[in-house]
Amino acid sequence: MELTSKQRAQLRGLANSIDTILIVGKDGIGENMLKQANDALEARELIKGRVLENALMSAREVADQLAPLTRSEVVQVIGTKFVLYRPSHRKDKKDKIVLVQDKKKAAK
């Protein structure tokens, strides 16, 4: 799923109010980190992460590696923080994020 610029802007706005829940340290991305990211994405759809200063990777590198492993999209990377999005497949989730549709694509 490729996000449009309008959808990215919408998700960036939503990400402003959420707390950082993933913290990547010097150990990098391990199985526990991957499980935590997958669980959080399924429950919340939009998650914010942070890379500590002692980490061996940059926030861009972490986001670019986590996205394909979690089947998510990188929404934003600023400094040591990153935001990932993946639509939830849970049927019991009441407050799903509804992305704006691009008018040009919808007309096709």
Where are these regions (language model features)?
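Positively charged, polar, low-complexity stretches
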Residues: M1-K108
